[in-house]
C-alpha cells in the first residue's frame, strides 16, 4: 500500500505508472522487444492504476455491494447459479461461488452476514439437495449390483465446502453424508493431486488425522524442487478439467499442508513458485488469480 501511496504523492501521472521495463530504453532496444515480457510491460501501467484503486475503501465497499447485487440477480430460485443467466443451475458453478465465500470468511475470520449470508444459505440448500439426489441414485444402482469406489468430484467438493464452512448437515442428509465420508479414504490411489489435497482436508477436518497424513505423504512424494522456482508439481496442465489446472492443485496442496501442520518449510517453498508464476507470466485466469 505504501508504494501506491507514494505514486499518488508523485501526482499519479501516466509517467509515474509506467512500468520499469518501459522506462529502460536499453532493454526496449534489444531483440527481446518482440518477447512476451515487453507485451506484459505495455499493460503494466494499466494494471498498476487498477491495483491502486484496491486501497480506496469507498471503492471497495461500492464494488462489494455491486458484486453481491449481481450475484443475487444471477442466482436461480432454487439457490443455484448457472453458467449464463437463464440456463439451468450448475453444481460446479454454485460450488465454486460458495467455496470462494467460505474461503473469504475463513481467511478474514469474519462470518458472512446480510445478503452474502442469504446467498450462501440458498446455495447450500441447492447443494444439499443435489448431494441427496446423487445418494439416492447410488443406492438404486447398488441394488442392481453396481459397486462404487471413492466419491464423485462434485461430492468431494461438497464435503470440502462443508468442512471449511462449518455448515451443519441437514437431518435428511445425515445418511448420505456419512456414506460419502466413509468413501473418501479410497481416493488415495487417485492420480489427481487436487483430488488428494481436497480429500486430505476433508479427512483432517472430520478428525481422521491418520488417514489425512497418508494423503499428505503421497502428495509430498510428487513435489519437485529447484532453487529458483521453489517447490511445485511438474505435470502438464489440462485447463479443460478442474483437477487438471495447476494453480488449483498447487494452492489446494498448500492449504492442506498448512492445515495439518509441520510443513512450514514446504509451504514457504510452494509460495515461491506461486509468486514466480506472477513474476514471469501472470496468473493465467480469474480462477487462478482468486486461488493464488
PLM features: residue spans?
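Large, well-folded core regions of big proteins
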Residues: 1-291
Amino acid at each position: 500500500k505504501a508504494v501506491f501511496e507514494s505514486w499518488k504523492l508523485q501526482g499519479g501521472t501516466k509517467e509515474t505508472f509506467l512500468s520499469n521495463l518501459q522506462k529502460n530504453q536499453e532493454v526496449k532496444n534489444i531483440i527481446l522487444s518482440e518477447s512476451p515480457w515487453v507485451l506484459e510491460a505495455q499493460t503494466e501501467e494499466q494494471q498498476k492504476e487498477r491495483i491502486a484503486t484496491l486501497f480506496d475503501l469507498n471503492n471497495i465497499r461500492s464494488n462489494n455491494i455491486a458484486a453481491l447485487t449481481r450475484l443475487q440477480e444471477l442466482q436461480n430460485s432454487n439457490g443455484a447459479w448457472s453458467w449464463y443467466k437463464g440456463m439451468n443451475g450448475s453444481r460446479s458453478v454454485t460450488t465454486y461461488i460458495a467455496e470462494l465465500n467460505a474461503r473469504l470468511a475463513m481467511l478474514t475470520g469474519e462470518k458472512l452476514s446480510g445478503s452474502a449470508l442469504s446467498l450462501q444459505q440458498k446455495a447450500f440448500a441447492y447443494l444439499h439437495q443435489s448431494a441427496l439426489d446423487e445418494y439416492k441414485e447410488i443406492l438404486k444402482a447398488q441394488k442392481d449390483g453396481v459397486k462404487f469406489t471413492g466419491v464423485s468430484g462434485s461430492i468431494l467438493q461438497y464435503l470440502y465446502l462443508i468442512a471449511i464452512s462449518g455448515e451443519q448437515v441437514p437431518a435428511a442428509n445425515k445418511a448420505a453424508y456419512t456414506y460419502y465420508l466413509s468413501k473418501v479414504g479410497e481416493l488415495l490411489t487417485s492420480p489427481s493431486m487436487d483430488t488428494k489435497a481436497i480429500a486430505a482436508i476433508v479427512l483432517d477436518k472430520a478428525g481422521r488425522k491418520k488417514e489425512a497424513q497418508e494423503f499428505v505423504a503421497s502428495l509430498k512424494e510428487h513435489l519437485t524442487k529447484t532453487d529458483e522456482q521453489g517447490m511445485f508439481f511438474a505435470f502438464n496442465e489440462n485447463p479443460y478439467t478442474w483437477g487438471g489446472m495447476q494453480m488449483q492443485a498447487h494452492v489446494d496442496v498448500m492449504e492442506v499442508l498448512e492445515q495439518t501442520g509441520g510443513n512450514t518449510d514446504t509451504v514457504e517453498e510452494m509460495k515461491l513458485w506461486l509468486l514466480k508464476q506472477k513474476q514471469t507470466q501472470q496468473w493465467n485466469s480469474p480462477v487462478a488469480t482468486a486461488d493464488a
